């Protein structure tokens, strides 16, 4: 179950700034559709069994709600926890105060409360960090690769797997479908994903891929004005809109950037063949696979997404 409620303790962003209360998150509830829960459970089993024998684990659902995940677990190896249990068999407890088993291997799987900008979900993950695997439905903030991403505050766990959930993955208390953009992620205490990911958080004080390009945020949107040097005084090699729906266009001037906000890309190499290859690469990349998906179904593109795309295609650039 997903429960969003008023938080008493002040929460903070990755940069340390205190969060403001979001009144829309007070006493709101929705539940994971059974078919979606089944897909998440099956994916968790598929990924984990590559590393361990599933028979060695007990399964734990925190914030169990109506037990949509709990009912999928082996009957003799399952624990359900909820602060307000809706059925018999669950342990009545705030998961953040629950003492996790230390003598058994544990897979923690479920849909924790998100809280404002995912901070409560972060607390659930960090409390579960002594579990062998943590498999949670999470807000899209956990997909972000920006330097302030909340996922860089996960302690003692490694991200093994992440996928975006399908549309209408939830139902409300009236059994009506609810479409909230979320991801399903699998974290491990012991194992790491062999596919490396570019971390802008670790490179935030550097100029990533400076041998190829420099990237600037440019905007004339109200209260977001920035990068005016590359709007009025200098011309970038090309521009991209930072907000788009189905596809994105590479344009030659800021005037063509949609919504007055975008990214200016400036070549740093004098190698014309390399620059041509770079521009072609930017046109061919499926940016929906890199950009962040917002609740209104639009995509937001930032520096971190561009750096990840370059990181994934370095072999093409180096073969020059």
How would you label these PLM feature ranges?
Residues 1-320:
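Class I S-adenosyl-L-methionine-dependent methyltransferase catalytic core
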């Amino acid at each position: 179950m997903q429960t969003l409620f008023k938080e008493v303790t002040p929460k903070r962003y990755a940069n340390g700034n205190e969060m403001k209360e979001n009144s829309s998150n007070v006493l709101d509830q929705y539940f994971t559709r059974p078919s979606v829960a089944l897909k998440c459970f099956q994916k968790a089993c598929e990924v984990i069994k590559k590393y361990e024998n599933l028979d060695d684990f007990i399964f734990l659902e925190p914030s169990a709600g109506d037990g949509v995940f709990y009912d999928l677990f082996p009957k003799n190896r399952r624990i359900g926890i909820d602060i307000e249990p809706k059925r018999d068999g669950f342990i009545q407890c705030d998961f953040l105060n629950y003492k996790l088993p230390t003598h058994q291997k544990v897979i923690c799987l479920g849909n924790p409360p998100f809280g404002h900008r995912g901070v409560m979900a972060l607390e659930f993950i960090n409390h579960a960090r002594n579990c062998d695997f943590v498999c949670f439905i999470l807000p899209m903030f956990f997909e972000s690769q920006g330097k302030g991403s909340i996922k860089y505050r996960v302690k003692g766990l490694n991200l093994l797997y992440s996928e975006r959930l399908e549309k209408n993955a939830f139902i409300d208390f009236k059994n009506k479908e609810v479409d909230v953009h979320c991801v399903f992620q699998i974290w491990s205490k012991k194992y790491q994903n062999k596919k490396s990911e570019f971390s802008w958080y670790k490179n935030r004080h550097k100029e990533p891929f400076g041998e190829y390009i420099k990237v600037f945020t440019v905007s004339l949107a109200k209260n977001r004005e920035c990068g005016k040097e590359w709007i009025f005084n200098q011309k970038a090699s090309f521009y991209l809109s930072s907000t788009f729906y189905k596809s994105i266009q590479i344009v030659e001037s800021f005037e063509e950037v949609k919504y007055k906000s975008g990214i200016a890309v400036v070549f740093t190499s004098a190698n014309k063949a390399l620059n041509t290859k770079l521009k072609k690469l930017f046109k061919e990349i499926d940016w929906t696979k890199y950009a962040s998906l917002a609740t209104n179904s639009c995509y937001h593109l930032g520096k971190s997404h561009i750096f990840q795309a370059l990181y994934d295609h370095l072999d093409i650039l180096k073969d020059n």
